[in-house]
Each structure stands twice: as C-alpha cells, then as structure tokens.
Design a protein with these regions (language model features):
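Short, conserved catalytic or interaction motifs in soluble domains
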Residues: 47
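Short, Lys/Arg-enriched N-terminal segments with co-localized hydrophobic residues
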Residues: 1-23
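A residue-level marker of the well-folded mature domains of exported/periplasmic proteins
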Residues: 50-388
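C-terminal motif of bacterial Sec signal peptides marking the signal peptidase cleavage site
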Residues: 41-44
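Hydrophobic helical h-region of N-terminal Sec-dependent signal peptides
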Residues: 33-37
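Bacterial N-terminal signal peptides that target proteins for export
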Residues: 23-32
Length: 388
C-alpha cells in the first residue's frame, strides 16, 4: 500500500520552517508576503481562464463503498480548484473518495494572504471527522487545531507532521503525507534527455533555497545525466525563499522559458505551480514562430489534461505527484480504522510519483523509462534529493 519513511535532514528543515512560520504568523505584514504558497508539493495558484472542474484525469483507486454517512473536509492551498496542478490533484482525490467510497465532502480555500487557515481548519473539523489540508504551510495550524479536536483526524500534504523533540508524530490524530518528488523527476529528466534534439534542456523552479523544489531539480538533473552526461542543463528559479510569489508568476515563468529556448533548450521542466502556465505559453509561441517544436514538462497533475487546449500539444509529459491517491488513501484509512499518525511517504514503488504518457509523445521511450523505474525501485539507482 504505502510506507512510513523518516528523512531526518529534510524533515528537520521542515521542523525549523514550521517554527519560523509560527513566528511569522504573529506579524501580518510579514505573512502577507506568502501570497502564493507551495502546494504538494508546491502549491499553486490558478491563472486566468482555468477550468474550475479540472483535476480528475487519472483513474480512481479501487475501494469498497463503505463510506456511507462519512463526511470529509478539504482545505485547499491558495487558489483552490482550477490551478491545473496541485490543488486540482487534491480535488480529484476527494472526488474519487466520493464516487468510490461513498463519502460526502465540503471544501474551502484560504484568503489571498492565507491568514485564515486556522479558522478554515476548525470550521471543517466542526463538521467532519477527517480534514485534509493541502500544503505544508498548514502544518503549524493543523497541529494546533488537531490538539484541540482529538476526535477528528487531520492529514497535511507535504509536511511530515512529526514532533522531532519527542521523536514521534506531532499528534495521534495528525498525519503527514510526503512524496519522493526527486524519483519522479528523475524519470522526466531521463525522458527529456532521450527526446532532446538540441542537447540542451531547462529547469524552472518556483521558489529557491528552502529545500523542497531542489528535490525536483536534483532528480531531473540526475535523470538527464543518467542518459547522457554531456547534455547541457539550464536552471533558474523565479523567486527565493521566503518570497513565495514564484508559484503564481506565469508571466515571469514565460519570460524565463523564452530565454531558455533562445539559449538552445528545446525541453523545459517546471516545478513552479501555477507559474507553469507561462512555460507552456512560451513553448507554443516559440514553436509557432520558429517552425521547430519545443516542449514543456508539467508537474503534479497530468498537465496534458489540465492546461488550456491551445497549449496541450506542447506538454511532453508531466511528473505525477499523486496527491489524489494520498487524499483518497487518507480518507479510506479513516473509514477502515487504520489511520496512521506521523509521516507516510509515497514514492515510485507505490506509484506515489511517476510520469504521464498522455499525448503519446513518449511511446517510443517508455521501455527505457520503465527500466530506469525498475532500477530505482530495486535500489540499483539512488536518486539524489538535493543539489549538493
């Protein structure tokens, strides 16, 4: 099913960041800088013209329809439904829980500065026995609300929900759902290396220097180099921590992508949430103006199925971060009485991360990608989770 994994160095950072977040929450002017947060990994805000019904592209997991009478609450990251990525994946998961397990659910989204996260968590806890919070910036508030509502289960995406001083879960009713983003990124990096015609590829990160998005970059880089160490990789981040605007800056991502294509890249991977829309716009414009096709690689959801139709043909693949499955499994475990506090990590071995094949653009290299996947799962390839 899934496995419990503890990553000391990365989770210590998250612990420190949670403490920092608690301090920041006391100062409204400072917390206002978090106008767009990481979602799943990397939470993302939706752009204009998004499909508010997007999200349920993948097939639902199997399950017994034993959730009749059970309700669940879902609190999105800023932007809510329609971000074509992180939030939509969470929405797909709870929609699957409704259709497969038979639950009912309610949902809410924070205000623009995220200052009402705690209130939304409490509101959902007042009405539901399990609450899912999308994004690690909920962790501090979720710990507090969980302590005040011991009969309600809470699950937070992208935070371990561990008490590092005590050496165990932060609360008996709080679960942290994390992902091996570097493993999935390795596979799309390998895909980029196998598909590039120019010998140059690019990576756009949303926010630098707080340890999470570097996992995407490290895995992507390792995958590229595993295929061909001579391929050139151009990398750029939109903003640096603690400025989270990089996850909601499609114009800036487009500008960066255009520069990368101008410098010879023909495939660019983004881990930038809602900013990724700008990458696909750039790919379309360059392809149409130059007559030579360039590509973008999506993240979190299968973005071939979530982006605007006009840019769909420029989505080579997406690194799938199965937030949908994590949400579904958390609700299923609550119903079954097997809810597990603390960190649950999802990786390649349980299809918690992966790559998409929509569009058929990878059909000729799937066997090679599956061979890499098998080697990672078997432990023959160790994928780095940092750029060090």
């Amino acid at each position: 099913m899934f496995r419990l994994v503890f990553h000391p160095s990365r989770e210590i950072f998250r612990h420190i960041f949670t403490k920092w977040r608690g301090i920041m929450s006391k100062n409204f002017k400072l917390i206002a800088t978090l106008v767009a947060v990481l979602g799943l990994f990397v939470g993302a805000c939706g752009g204009s013209g998004v499909n508010k019904d997007a999200g349920q592209a993948a097939a639902c997991p199997d399950g017994d329809n034993n959730g009749d009478g059970v309700t669940a609450g879902l609190v999105f990251d800023i932007g809510g439904r329609g971000d074509q990525s992180f939030n939509d994946s969470a929405a797909a998961g709870i929609e699957c829980a409704k259709s497969v397990l038979g639950i009912e659910f309610s949902e809410s989204s924070p205000n623009d500065d995220g200052s009402n996260r705690a209130e939304l968590l409490q509101l959902q806890a007042d009405n539901n026995p399990i609450v899912i919070a999308v994004g690690f910036l909920f962790a501090g508030d979720a710990a507090t609300v969980a302590a005040n509502n011991p009969d309600t289960n809470f699950a937070v995406i992208d935070d371990a929900m561990m008490d590092f001083e005590a050496g165990g879960p932060i609360a008996d009713n709080a679960a942290g759902l994390t992902f091996a983003e570097h493993e999935g990124s390795f596979l799309v990096g390998a895909a980029a290396a196998l598909k590039t015609e120019t010998g140059t590829v690019g990576f756009i990160g949303g926010v630098c220097c707080f340890g999470l998005i570097e996992k995407f970059e490290a895995g992507f880089t390792a995958g590229v180099k595993a295929v061909n160490p001579d391929i050139n990789i151009i990398s750029q981040y939109i903003t640096e921590f603690p400025d989270f605007d990089g996850f909601n800056a499609p114009d800036r991502a487009k500008e960066i992508a255009l520069a990368m294509y101008s410098d010879g890249a023909d495939i660019v991977y983004h881990a930038a949430g809602g900013s990724g829309a700008g990458l696909f716009e750039a790919a379309m414009e360059v392809s149409e103006s130059s007559g030579s096709k360039v590509w973008g690689i999506g993240v979190d959801s299968d973005q071939y199925n979530t982006v605007d139709e006009a840019v769909r043909e420029y989505v080579l693949t997406s690194m799938l971060k199965r937030v949908d499955n994590a949400v579904f499994l958390a609700i299923q475990s609550h119903i079954d009485g097997t809810f597990q506090a603390g960190q649950t990590a999802f990786g390649l071995s349980d299809d918690g991360v992966g790559y998409s094949t929509s569009g058929g653009y990878l059909d000729d290299i799937v066997d090679e990608l599956e061979a890499f996947k098998a080697d990672i799962v078997a432990g023959n390839i160790s994928v780095p989770d940092s750029m060090e």
